[in-house]
């Protein structure tokens, strides 16, 4: 059947113009991206406090070390894309990057945080190893170029409204700044109102552009569906994560919390910290067979 959505060689045209500019494998501290070894990006959605963020970092670090998966810790200093103006956003750039810098120093972990404005990129880059472009902002040229100019690795989350092959343009914006250290994250596609679905074909499509990570927690989000905030279906996190690992992703992105019902952001789609170890053990077993 013909149609603009059909997966054909023509849909990979952006891959042909950008793939030579992207590193298919690169290091982020001790983590090798695109090496064939599955890696993990995990942490709370937002910095709720220094003590809480540090506690989560240390707990996730222990679990990752025990099961044998390389870890990049993540947390946000500002959630600028919340549904409501009344929602908690975080401590802000100055205090948030201070906290993330201390956690990176004390744990030895590489750290990821998201940036929302070009002016934030250089400041955040002084504290963290990976700058993340939020899905809602994945077409913002100035933001992508500014992130690329820092020299830090850049994780671009695919917008809920973007075709996977069109992410080649986002990749090219980062590489135009002379930075080949780019990877992409799938986090679901809008399917009607307040709902997301995951098209696993996108993982194969985007791997022609750059290394690919699957976000198993935001993919089960039901955006803006819970009275001024987002809901979620966390019971499907293991289902989608297993499928993504079997499909050959390079890494996994999981937001975890020790008390999801009381999390200050995205608790409805977070993975309970107690469930992280058994999930990772199962995913690593699948990866060993599938790779």
What is the meaning of each model-derived region?
Residues 151-256:
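Catalytic alpha/beta core domains of metabolic enzymes, predominantly
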Residues 37-41, 70-74, 110-112, 129-130, ...:
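Structural preference for beta-strand elements that scaffold enzyme active sites
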Residues 91-92, 109-120, 129-142, 153-164, ...:
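Catalytic beta/alpha-barrel core
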Residues 60-62, 88-111, 147-153, 203-212, ...:
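Alpha-helix-loop-beta-strand connector modules within alpha/beta enzyme cores
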Residues 47-59, 91-98, 231-239:
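Glycine-rich anion/phosphate-binding loops
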């Amino acid at each position: 059947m013909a149609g603009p959505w059909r997966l054909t060689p023509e849909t990979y045209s952006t891959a042909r113009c950008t793939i030579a500019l992207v590193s298919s494998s690169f290091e982020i501290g001790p983590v090798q991206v695109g090496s064939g070894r599955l890696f993990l990006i995990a942490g709370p959605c937002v910095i709720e406090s220094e003590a809480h963020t540090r506690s989560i970092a240390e707990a996730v670090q222990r679990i990752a070390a025990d099961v044998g998966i390389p870890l990049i810790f993540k947390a946000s200093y500002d959630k600028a894309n919340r549904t409501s103006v009344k929602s908690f956003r975080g401590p802000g750039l100055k205090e948030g990057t201070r906290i993330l810098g201390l956690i990176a120093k004390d744990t030895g972990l590489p750290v990821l945080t998201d940036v929302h404005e070009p002016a934030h990129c250089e400041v955040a880059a002084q504290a963290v190893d990976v700058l993340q472009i939020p899905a809602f902002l994945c077409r913002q040229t100035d933001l992508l170029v500014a992130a690329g100019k820092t020299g830090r690795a850049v994780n671009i989350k695919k917008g809920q409204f973007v075709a996977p092959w069109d992410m080649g343009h986002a990749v090219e914006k980062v590489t135009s700044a002379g930075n080949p250290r780019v990877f992409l994250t799938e986090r679901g596609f809008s399917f009607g109102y307040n709902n997301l679905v995951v098209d696993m074909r996108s993982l194969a499509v985007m791997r022609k552009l750059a290394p690919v990570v699957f976000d198993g927690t935001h993919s089960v989000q039901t955006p803006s569906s819970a009275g001024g905030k987002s809901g979620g279906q966390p019971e499907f996190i293991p289902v989608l994560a297993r499928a993504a690992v079997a499909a050959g992703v390079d890494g996994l992105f999981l937001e975890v919390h020790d008390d999801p019902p009381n999390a200050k952001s995205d608790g409805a789609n977070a993975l309970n910290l107690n469930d992280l170890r058994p999930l990772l053990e199962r995913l690593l077993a699948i990866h060993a067979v599938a790779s």
